From Swiss-Prot:
UniProt KW Zinc keyword: yes
Source species: Schizosaccharomyces pombe (strain 972 / ATCC 24843)
Protein name per the record: Probable Rho-type GTPase-activating protein 4
Function text: GTPase-activating protein for Rho-type proteins.
Database matches in PANTHER family: RHO GTPASE-ACTIVATING PROTEIN RGD1, RHO/RAC/CDC GTPASE-ACTIVATING PROTEIN
Annotated positions for site Arginine finger: 783
Example of a GO cellular component annotation carried by this entry: cell cortex
GO biological process terms, semicolon-separated: establishment or maintenance of bipolar cell polarity; negative regulation of cell integrity MAPK cascade; positive regulation of establishment of bipolar cell polarity; positive regulation of establishment of cell polarity regulating cell shape; regulation of actin filament bundle assembly; regulation of cell wall organization or biogenesis; small GTPase-mediated signal transduction
Length: 933
């Protein structure tokens, strides 16, 4: 699997695969054949074969452990088992529902990082797979929820919105109310009175040869559906006269169809009249699931002279009723007053609300029922009711629309005219009852008359109500219908999703057993503890790394502070030394000028002053100044036997007194721990007793004779002697200057090709033993330098194989010999070929990487050099342990030994890499047990 963690369950073996020496992969030491454990191609000590986490020793013969990609061993108690593949998880896991999993996608098995994954049904998915699962889930939810429009195809929803709107009264067939039977009107108004049915899911129902508008997949076009609703007229037209409000925008928007122009149904045009039989075929069955329809009703308007327009000759109206003046119906309008129309405009969203529809229909019906005459004994009241109640110049909404005269159905007119006496006879005979004593009582004639007139009145009222809804309430645009259709589809989708979620939650609740509060609390606490433990384990490696970095930074800061302090001390020390050197230089220049002046005077004098026998005439008495010193000529003359006369008259007095000024050298030496006490030049130089003579001493030199310097005979002995003294002094000075100690480098100890040591020299071992025996608490150990004479003596002793030094030897001289021997090696202890690998390992940021790099460099050294380096580093670690007494910490020791142990082959990077070398050597001293484990 590619989840980032691969387990290697290799077979274990206690046998050595080869006869060569094997090294433990953990401790880097050789493993004897009796305690070797082989696993995954690597060798371990039997004691090193432990769990990395709990440090538990593992049994090689069992299989209760596993290995990750980093070659680390884990026991089964320290790792989790994956819920998906039942294999151990060695690195980190992904927890879902208190179950651990590999950090990989459950679908494509790709490794998941912490910023790009999600959980779905208890499984982990990457983002592409999660989107795919979401789409499949949404598709399943939409397929399971019937009757709603999928939200993913909004364009298709917008295209089919007009089909749904056609069922809601915006694009409907047109009919004449007077030619429709009562059953048709009652059925349609019954459907209209239940507006909540429009919110039900629509199914595919085959009606009148086409699929209902509720089917969004209907392949029929709008024109085909229009043809099914608007049938061809059969040469029957009713001519209407123009009305005052026929040209108004509200009238056109309320009555015009989106499929036709507004002029097709304008006042004065031909209105198609459908036969009753053809319209009955298009009536929706009450048992079907088709949405209720509120159709448009067109009512004929009277002419200006008060007469009705005439029908064609083949169509006639039997006994048309006279014009009646109807009473005004107090119906509360839902029209808004913000429309530019004079008579208001009803918003499509408000008009389509089921609450408004139901309330409007209820108000109209109640008003119609209240208009029935209560005094049934009075025919005059009944006649007045029919005269005043059926016609009005105002609509129920008080919008003052054109009058809607009542046009009686031909079937009802025939039924009324077929009665024995007729309507006029009944109206005439009704006056007899008014004068009778029983005028207020009910009789069968009045009841029958009321029953005969009530259906006609109800039809007329319903026609008016239908006209109210079609002309005023359902005044909406196609855009609002589209918005409503989209909103209904969204709500249906949400309802389906909520139903599925409720069903799943109910099933889960039924399956689960009731849990007590205490048990639930315990389970919750256990789950939280598990999650906290998981978080602690997941953050533990990062915290360990941060802690190591913090310690490294703290160490670096402390080292930098110590280095800064040391630099400041050395700077102060150098300033003091510089001041001393300046004063010494000035004094030497004055002495040199004085000597040159004296020599010039002697050469230009007529006689050789110091060999003149005349003590009084040619003697020059000079009192030397306090800054005078012996000349080289006087020193050589004294060594050759020319002794000056002793002057006992004057002895040294005040010049031998101690200088009263403060000795700055001692104070600075005590403060800054100077390596060695150097002669401090005071402002007043010390003068010997021989130089305090008040008179110049004279020696007797013969004029002719042999020279005591070169042994030659000369007639001008004085001049020859002067030249010989000068040449002798120069030879002695040059021989003394060229003297240098000879170090004991035995050629047999080196490889002639690589110039590396073949064995550990006895000088190194002897010096280390002497220092650890007598000088561990010596202040300034390895910092102070010894005298050259003592160094020569120690080298002579060690050359004669006298490895045991006397305790009286100078510690500083021994340390100087030790350092000088390491400095004079032709190839340093850390050889030239390992210089750059050593610098690379020192630049590693991680502690473990740096440690591994130093170990690899040490293993690459020649055996003798690796052994000497281990001997020196362990010795310096023991010296640093006494830093409270000798003031030599690991940092100070690294500064002293890094130039001798680590050298650049070209001597070009000594200054650049000086800080890195010092830090690296201090690291080796501080971690000697880890490096040389």
């Amino acid at each position: 699997m590619n989840s980032g963690t691969t387990l290697h369950l290799d077979r274990l073996s206690l046998e050595t695969p080869s006869e060569r020496t094997c090294f433990c992969i953990k401790c880097w030491e050789s493993v004897p054949s009796t305690s070797q454990v082989w696993f995954g191609g690597k060798c371990w000590h039997s004691d090193c074969f432990k769990c990395v986490n709990c440090n538990k020793k593992l049994d090689p013969s069992s299989e209760d452990f596993s290995q990750d990609d980093q070659k680390q061993i884990f026991c089964k108690l320290c790792v989790d088992i994956c819920n998906g593949c039942s294999t151990p998880i060695c690195e980190f896991n992904a927890v879902s529902n208190s179950q651990a999993n590999h950090p990989c996608c459950s679908n494509c098995r790709a490794f998941i990082n912490s910023n790009a994954f999600g959980k779905f049904k208890g499984q982990h998915y990457c983002l592409p797979c999660l989107r795919k699962q979401d789409e499949e889930n949404q598709k399943a939810v939409m397929e399971s929820a019937s009757g709603f429009i999928p939200l993913r195809n909004i364009a298709q929803t917008a295209e089919n919105t007009s089909l749904t709107g056609q069922n809601q009264g915006f694009q409907n067939p047109h009919f004449i109310a007077s030619d429709s039977p009562s059953s048709v009107l009652s059925g349609r108004m019954q459907n209209t009175s239940s507006p909540t049915n429009s919110l039900r899911p629509q199914l595919k129902v085959q009606t009148n040869g086409y699929e209902t508008p509720g089917d969004i997949n209907s392949a029929k076009s709008y024109k085909d559906i229009q043809k099914d609703f608007l049938l061809k007229p059969k040469n029957s037209f009713v001519k209407t006269s123009p009305s005052p409000l026929a040209n108004g925008p509200s009238f056109r928007s309320a009555n015009a169809s989106p499929f036709d122009s507004c002029d097709s149904f304008h006042s004065g045009s031909s209105i198609p009249i459908e036969p009753v039989s053809s319209r009955q075929s298009s009536v929706v069955n009450n048992n079907s699931v088709q949405q209720p329809v509120a159709y448009h009703a067109f009512v004929q308007s009277p002419t200006e002279n008060g007469t009705l327009p005439q029908l064609p000759k083949n169509e006639s109206v039997v006994n048309p009723p006279p014009l009646r003046r109807s009473s005004t119906m107090n119906y509360k309008s839902v029209s808004t007053t913000t429309s530019p129309s004079k008579y208001g405009y009803v918003s499509g969203r408000i008009a389509l609300s089921p609450i408004h529809l139901r309330g409007a229909l209820r108000d109209v019906t109640n008003k119609c029922n209240l208009k029935v005459p209560r005094n049934r004994n009075s025919l005059s009241n009944l006649d007045e009711y029919y005269v005043n109640g059926l016609e009005s110049d105002e609509t129920p909404t008080k919008a003052r629309f054109p009058r809607y005269p009542t046009v009686f159905n031909k079937l009802d007119d025939k039924r009324l005219s077929s009665e024995p006496n007729g309507l006029k006879k009944r109206l005439t005979n009704s006056s007899n009852y008014e004068a009778s004593p029983r005028a207020k009582s009910l009789n069968l004639s009045q009841v029958s008359l009321h029953q005969a007139c009530e259906p006609e009145y109800n039809r007329s009222s319903l026609v008016r109500a239908s006209d109210v809804f079609t002309s005023n309430v359902f005044d909406a645009t196609e855009e609002s219908a589209n918005e409503l259709a989209i909103r209904i589809s969204e709500l249906q989708a949400e309802v389906g999703t909520l139903l599925l979620e409720a069903t799943s939650l109910a099933s889960i609740i039924e399956q689960q057993t009731p849990v007590s509060p205490e048990a639930f609390k315990q389970e919750l606490v256990a789950d939280l503890n598990y999650r906290l433990d998981y978080l602690r384990k997941s953050f533990q490696p990062e915290l360990s790394t941060l802690l190591l970095r913090r310690d490294a930074l703290s160490t670096t800061v402390s080292k930098l502070q110590n280095a800064y302090s040391t630099v400041m001390e050395e700077t102060a020390y150098l300033n003091v030394k510089n001041t001393e050197l300046v004063s010494l230089n000035n004094q030497l220049e004055r002495e040199l000028a004085y000597l040159r002046e004296q020599q010039h005077k002697k050469r230009t004098s007529s006689s050789f002053g110091i060999f003149n026998n005349d003590k009084k005439s040619n003697r020059t008495i000079s009192t030397p100044s306090p800054r005078e010193s012996f000349s080289r000529l006087q020193m050589v003359a004294s060594s050759l036997g020319f002794r000056p006369k002793d002057n006992k008259d004057k002895e040294s007095g005040g010049y031998n007194k101690r200088n009263s000024k403060i000795d700055l050298k001692k104070s600075f030496s005590k403060r800054f721990h100077w390596k060695r006490d150097s002669p401090h030049m005071s402002s007043t130089p010390s003068i010997s007793e021989e130089h305090l003579a008040s008179e110049e001493q004279e020696d007797f030199v013969p004029a002719v004779g042999h020279c005591k310097l070169c042994g030659k005979y000369s007639n001008e002995l004085r001049a020859h002697y002067q030249d010989c003294v000068s040449s002798t002094i120069d030879r002695q000075y040059q021989s003394k200057k060229s003297e240098s100690p000879v170090w004991a480098l035995n050629p047999d100890d080196f490889d002639q090709n690589r110039l590396t040591l073949l064995r550990v020299p006895t000088l190194i071992v002897s010096c280390i033993n002497f220092i650890e025996s007598y000088g561990m608490d010596f202040e300034g150990l390895y910092r102070k330098s010894g005298a050259t004479s003592q160094m020569k003596k120690i080298v002579a002793l060690l050359r004669n194989e006298d490895t045991v030094l006397d305790p009286s030897e100078d510690i500083s001289a021994v340390t100087s010999v030790f350092k000088q021997y390491l400095r004079n090696l032709p190839n340093p202890i850390i050889t030239y070929d390992q210089y750059f690998p050593f610098i690379t390992a020192a630049n590693c940021a991680s502690f473990q990487d740096k440690l591994d790099g130093f170990i690899m460099v040490i293993k690459s050294l020649p055996p003798a050099h690796a052994e000497i380096l281990q001997l020196i580093i362990r010795h310096l670690a023991r010296v640093a342990a006494y830093s409270h007494a000798n003031r030599m910490t690991s940092k100070n020791l690294a500064v002293v030994f890094s130039p001798t142990l680590i050298r650049d082959p070209d001597n070009s990077r000594d200054v650049i890499d000086m800080t890195v070398k010092n830090y690296s050597l201090a690291f080796l001293i501080d971690h000697v047990h880890e490096v040389f484990a």
